[in-house]
């Protein structure tokens, strides 16, 4: 029997509502029959509308309510089905939630978790599919989590909920159908925020990614290994705090670096990793580091264009060969065929 990321997130939310009377869930659509892509299904029926609260379309005001609840001793989890909608609440996040603990000398905690779901798929276009994790990581006082796999998505969410101060949990809905056996021992493991995971070991090149990009990166890494290139894949899991120790340990070994970032290239988190590595590494790299990310343009809506715009396993593998100055195999595209449509798998039926 298998479970997936959707079921694991629902399990975590259910458990916290059951075990902690101070835990609340708020957001647009949390009581909807679709239950935020299935992650809140049945919760309002089990725990009532005073614990699972449908909110008005007023993101800034409702985030202020969430901050106030957290300061008052509750543990609210706010959900936005589109990261883009949360832009309206940046004032409350930046000037209240992120700074409160610091402004009051550490005497007051703000245990607020904000689940932001990125909306790629079915022609969502420029205003429903942005990846703004670099933006959030720039804000002092915030932690930023980006789950990738079914094996630790639930543990990362639980660690975010347990944290005494605000955590932005950025969740790509393309990870929702990632499968794992219900008896897999990894589902029982706890995760510490700020600790990356080496998903596959290698000596030739370090590939660093997070969120859904780790899934595409793993496809590329498996292809590279089949071609005799031992790539090491690091899934960051949290981009703030950033686990530079694990990154540097790997780069010292491989002496080659490729960073994969789901966001736009300019002022990106991927460039932050490259800069930190170059400032910290004691030995010379064999080749200049590379970044695979989005171009400096808004996301297109057209199905005919989106495939080329987004980062894929093909682009990642191609960049790895280029980093190592190795010819790209002729069967690359045939073996790692890019998605022909803007959907991750047959499970994804839209419209959202």
Language model features: what each stretch is:
Residues 1-166, 170, 175, 336-352, ...:
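Thiamine diphosphate
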């Amino acid at each position: 029997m298998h479970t997936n990321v959707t079921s694991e997130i629902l399990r975590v939310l259910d458990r916290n509502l059951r075990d902690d009377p101070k835990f609340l869930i708020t957001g647009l659509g949390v009581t909807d029959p679709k239950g935020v892509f299935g992650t809140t299904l049945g919760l309002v029926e089990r725990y009532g509308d005073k614990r699972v609260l449908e909110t008005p379309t007023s993101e800034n005001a409702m985030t202020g309510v969430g901050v106030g609840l957290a300061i008052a001793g509750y543990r609210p989890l706010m959900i936005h089905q589109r990261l883009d909608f949360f832009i309206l609440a940046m004032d409350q996040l930046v000037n209240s939630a992120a700074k409160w603990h610091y402004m009051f000398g550490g005497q007051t905690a703000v245990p607020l978790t904000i689940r932001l779901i990125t909306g790629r798929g079915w022609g969502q276009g420029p205003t429903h599919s942005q990846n703004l994790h670099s933006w959030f990581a720039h804000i002092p006082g915030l932690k930023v989590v980006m789950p990738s796999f079914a094996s630790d998505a639930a543990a990362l969410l639980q660690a975010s909920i347990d944290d005494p101060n605000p955590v932005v949990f950025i969740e790509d809905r393309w990870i929702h159908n990632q499968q794992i056996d219900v008896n897999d021992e990894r589902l029982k493991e706890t995760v510490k925020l700020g600790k990356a995971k080496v998903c596959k070991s290698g000596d030739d090149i370090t590939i660093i990614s997070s969120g859904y990009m780790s899934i595409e990166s793993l496809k590329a890494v498996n292809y590279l290994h089949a071609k005799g290139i031992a790539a090491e894949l690091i899934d960051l899991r949290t981009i703030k705090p950033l686990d530079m120790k694990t990154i540097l340990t790997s780069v010292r070994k491989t002496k080659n670096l490729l960073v994969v970032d789901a966001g736009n290239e300019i002022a990106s988190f991927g460039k932050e990793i490259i800069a930190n590595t170059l400032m910290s590494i004691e030995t010379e790299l064999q080749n200049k580091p590379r970044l695979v990310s989005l171009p400096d343009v808004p996301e297109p809506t057209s199905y005919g264009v989106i495939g080329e715009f987004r980062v894929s396993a093909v682009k990642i593998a191609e960049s790895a060969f280029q980093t190592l100055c190795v010819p790209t195999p002729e069967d690359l595209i045939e073996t790692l065929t890019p998605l022909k449509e803007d959907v991750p798998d047959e499970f994804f039926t839209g419209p959202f």
